[in-house]
């Protein structure tokens, strides 16, 4: 699907990466935003502890955003709102925040989910900020918000291993690799 994704500019299969920041490993999963890929979305949402809702500063909430956010809120996931592309020009911040709040209300967000933090960003320029008035110099404000707003994973480290595999990859040196979330127990290197 990579060729189709590049050609159409959409995400079909989830992409997973990890960032080590301030002593914490943050796993980030880019999931399809469209209902046509609902199976992929549901599979991935079972692995995450919270979601980042990316909103285009100029275009606002996209129609495909509704599907994924509705699923995430229905599963009780906490959302962190990232207003991206704030470098592209003027936009009405108040109107955009109202649009986001209406979306959360329409989708049945509970009180905890409705109390979401907003981060302003320019992914293209590589910065994030907690206020629109100042441009950041890096993505630290976004990563700090992830650590403070998204709940840490829960699980029983002492129980038998329970691993939810969500993706299978291949490496020519290692072979097949199962990528997933450890719900119980632990895995040792070696």
Annotate each language-model stretch with its function.
Residues 1-190:
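Structural and coupling elements of P-loop NTPases
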